[in-house]
Amino acid sequence: MRKSDARRAGARAVPVPLLVPALVGLAFLLLPLIALVVRAPWSGLPEQLASPQVWQALRLSLLCATSATLLSLVVGVPLAWLLARTEFPGRGFVRALVTLPLVLPPVVGGVALLLAFGRNGVIGQWLDAWFGITLPFTTTGVILAETFVAMPFLVISVEGTLRAADPRFEEAATTLGASRFTAFRRVTLPLIAPGVAAGAVLAWARALGEFGATITFAGNFPGRTQTMPLAVYLALQNDPAAAIALSLVLLAVSIAVLAGLRDRWMRAA
C-alpha cells in the first residue's frame, strides 16, 4: 500500500475517543426500546389492540398532533420570519419567551394555560362570557396544550433556516416591485421549505408525545381528551400489559411517520 493510501485510510478511521461515547449514546437510546419490544406480551397483543379504546385514543392523538402542527405552522412561520428578518426593541427578550416552553416543565405550562384560558382565566373568562367558548377539558384544549409545547421547535428550526438563507433574493424581489409579503411567499418560503418541513416534523413528534400540559389543561376523558400518552399512563396503574401494548402502537406509528417524512423531505432538501 502506498503511503498516500495509508494516510487517506488513517484519515477516514473513526477515532476511538469519539467512537466509544457514540456507541454508548446509541445503546442508551436503543436499549429501552429493545426492552419494550422484548418484554411485550405478544400472545395477548391482538386482544389488547382489539379494544375500541386503543383506536379511539390513537385517532385522537393523530388528530390533535396534526392540528397542533398546522396551527404551529400558521403562527410559527411568521413569528420565525419576524425574529430572523426584522429589527425591533426587545427582540432578544421575545426570542427567549418563544423558547421558554422548551425548558418549562409541561405541567407548569398546563397550569399557565389554565390561568390564561380557563373559565376564570385572564382570557378565558371573556371567551366564556362573550362567546360561550370553554377551552379546558375539551379536544380543542388538547390541541392548544400541544401547540404550546410544540411550536417552539418549529420556530427555532425555521428561524435558523431563515438566518442561513441569503436575504438578497428577497431584496431583489422587492426591488423588482414585489411587496414584502409577495417576496416572502414566492421567494423566501420555497427557499426555506426544507427547514419548515423539519420543524413541522419535530413539532408533530413533540405534540404526539405530549402528556403533562395536556392532562393539566384538558384532563383525561376517554374519547374527548385521552390521547395515547394519557392512555398509557392510565393503563400502567392497573394493567401493565395493556400499557406495553399501547406503547408499542405509539412507537410503531411514530417510527413509520417520522421515517417516511424524514426520507421524503431529506431528498427534497
Where are these regions (language model features)?
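Short, intrinsically disordered terminal tails adjacent to the first/last structured region
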Residues: 1-4
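Membrane-water interface segments at the C-terminal ends of transmembrane alpha-helices
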Residues: 9-43, 52-163, 187, 191-212, ...
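Short coil/turn motifs that cap or connect alpha-helices
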Residues: 89, 179-180
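Short glycine/proline-centered loop/turn elements that form peptide/ligand docking sites
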Residues: 165-169
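The alpha-helix within a helix-turn-helix
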Residues: 173
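Glycine/proline-centered hinge or cleavage motifs at structural transition points of membrane proteins
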Residues: 176-178, 190
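Short hydrophobic, aromatic-rich alpha-helical segments embedded in or entering the lipid bilayer
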Residues: 221-236
